[in-house]
């Protein structure tokens, strides 16, 4: 470095003009013309995030997925047709916005292309011009899915109930730095082949019965590389450029807060951060870009797979919620466990995610109940606690403290104005708002995209 530059002089030999640090600091605090709106599941998933995203995506310029893989499942109903999404952002339906699969997502290419083909058959068009995939995203291979099944089988009766989509093994490969990224596939194919064979050999050492036809897999992935190439970009700079241009950017969280690997009911969780932190790391965003955080809350609680569930119902009401709510997993096809709304849980996920508003879904499923219970706190070993247990052993032992509210015994399916809801339904919603200190801005009362109440202030 020259003496002139070391002394802070200008490039023409004159003294450099002092920067206005105050103005510079303000620009750092708010460097963009727009902020990101984030939609996150507030419970154990299946809250109806896809419907909310589809609604908000009609006004968005960019819709992003930031984490997870095809273990997630969203269903969006458009003109009576069910569009099922696992890897694709739900915003792909909007032909005016760009859909981004970010660096934090793990991508199973056979699943991605199959998903595109199935949705094309239902009417999805021109997606090639709207879908952008991060060059930094990691790839889920069939071998990861094979390993997922082998690991679950080894656990026997103590299995975690994973989707066996290979998500955990892929994130493990990422963490141990032998994972393979999109950029590897699109680079020197010889180098990609060597990395793939190395991954196969590692798993062969771990699992004696593990078998992969390496040659046929490499032939398949050479074809995938060319199909994928036109879709791949550096999504970090793309998202930042969109914000600098003042575009509306929407982020669709997959899974949900209680499945977050750090804040969920570990180990009965997924392998990514599906809370607000995953949005930042999964897209390369700094905290000051976050604007609205919409927590999607089902009017009752459901869970797929194993793990503690304090408000779970094992009676006819649980069966009624399952039947009326059509509670079968989009990805796993497993019946969802059902229980009462849990405010203690929602306060906890609200602390982690910082919800600025709530979308309450499936209110109509409660229409036939005479009484509705709501969990308001937990008691552990005889003492009322003001925190959410980090230990699943403790969570499995809590006693749930409920309040009971009257049901409304009227259909809400055709209601489109909050004031036209039965008074008891209005009370139920206001009770949730008052407890969480967060406004309910939307209420889902049916399956279709039009079956939603926009709550006006």
UniProtKB/Swiss-Prot annotation:
UniProt-annotated binding residues for GTP: 45-51, 73-75, 336, 362-364, 444-446
PROSITE patterns the record matches: ADENYLOSUCCIN_SYN_1, ADENYLOSUCCIN_SYN_2
Enzyme class: ligase
Amino-acid positions noted as binding substrate in the UniProt annotation, renumbered to this chain: 330-336
Enzyme Commission numbers on file: 6.3.4.4
Its job: Plays an important role in the de novo pathway and in the salvage pathway of purine nucleotide biosynthesis. Catalyzes the first committed step in the biosynthesis of AMP from IMP.
Name under which the protein is recorded: Adenylosuccinate synthetase
Positions with a binding annotation for IMP: 46-49, 71-74, 163, 177, 255, 270, 334
Cofactor note: Binds 1 Mg(2+) ion per subunit.
Annotated signal sequence range: none
Catalysis: reaction(s): IMP + L-aspartate + GTP = N(6)-(1,2-dicarboxyethyl)-AMP + GDP + phosphate + 2 H(+)
UniProt family annotation: Belongs to the adenylosuccinate synthetase family.
Biological process (GO), any one: IMP metabolic process
GO molecular function, one term: GTP binding
Keywords, ordered alphabetically: Cytoplasm, GTP-binding, Ligase, Magnesium, Metal-binding, Nucleotide-binding, Purine biosynthesis
Disulfide bridge map: none
This protein's pathway: Purine metabolism; AMP biosynthesis via de novo pathway; AMP from IMP: step 1/2
Cofactor(s), by name: Mg(2+)
Highest taxon in the source lineage: Eukaryota
Localization: Cytoplasm
UniProt subunit comment: Homodimer.
UniProt binding sites for Mg(2+): 46, 73
Native organism: Aedes aegypti
Active-site positions on this chain: 46 (proton acceptor), 74 (proton donor)
An annotated GO cellular component: cytoplasm
């Amino acid at each position: 470095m020259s003496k002139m530059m070391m002394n802070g002089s200008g490039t023409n030999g004159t003294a450099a003009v002092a920067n206005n640090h105050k103005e510079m600091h303000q620009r750092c605090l708010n460097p963009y013309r727009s902020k990101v709106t984030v939609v996150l599941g507030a419970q154990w998933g299946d809250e109806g995030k896809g419907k909310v995203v589809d609604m908000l995506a009609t006004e968005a310029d960019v819709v992003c997925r930031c984490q997870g893989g095809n273990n997630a499942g969203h269903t969006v109903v458009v003109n009576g047709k069910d569009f099922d999404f696992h890897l694709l952002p739900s915003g792909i339906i909007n032909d005016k916005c760009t859909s981004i699969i970010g660096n934090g997502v793990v991508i199973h290419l056979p699943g991605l292309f199959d998903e595109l083909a199935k949705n094309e058959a239902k009417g999805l068009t021109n997606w090639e011009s709207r879908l952008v995939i991060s060059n930094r995203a990691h790839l889920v291979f069939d071998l990861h899915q094979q390993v997922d099944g082998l690991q679950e089988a080894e656990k026997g009766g103590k299995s975690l109930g994973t989707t066996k989509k290979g998500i955990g093994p892929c994130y493990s490969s990422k963490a141990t730095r032998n994972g393979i990224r999109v950029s590897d596939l699109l680079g020197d194919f010889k180098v990609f082949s060597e990395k793939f064979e190395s991954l196969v050999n590692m798993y062969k050492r771990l699992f004696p019965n593990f078998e992969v036809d390496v040659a046929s897999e490499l032939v398949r992935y050479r074809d995938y590389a060319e199909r994928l190439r036109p879709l791949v970009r550096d999504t970090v700079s793309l998202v930042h450029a969109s914000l600098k241009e003042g575009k509306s950017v929407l982020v669709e969280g997959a899974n949900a807060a209680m499945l977050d690997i750090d804040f969920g009911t570990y180990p009965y969780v997924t392998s990514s951060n599906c809370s607000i932190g995953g949005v930042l790391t999964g897209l390369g965003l700094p905290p000051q870009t976050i604007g609205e955080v919409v927590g999607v809350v089902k009017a009752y609680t459901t869970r797929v797979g194993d793990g503690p569930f304090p408000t779970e119902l094992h009676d006819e009401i649980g069966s009624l919620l399952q039947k009326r709510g059509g509670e079968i997993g989009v990805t796993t096809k497993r019946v969802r466990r059902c229980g009462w709304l849990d405010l203690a849980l929602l306060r906890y996920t609200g602390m982690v995610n910082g919800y600025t508003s709530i979308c309450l879904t499936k209110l109509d499923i409660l229409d036939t109940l005479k009484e509705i219970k709501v969990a308001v706190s937990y008691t552990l070993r005889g003492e009322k606690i003001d925190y959410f247990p980090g230990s699943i052993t403790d969570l499995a032992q809590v006693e749930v403290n409920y309040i009971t509210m009257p049901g409304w015994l009227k259909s809400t399916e055709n209601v489109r104005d909050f004031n036209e809801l039965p008074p008891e339904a209005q009370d139920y919603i206001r009770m949730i708002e008052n407890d969480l200190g967060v406004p309910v801005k939307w209420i889902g009362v049916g399956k279709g995209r039009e079956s939603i109440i926009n709550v006006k202030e």
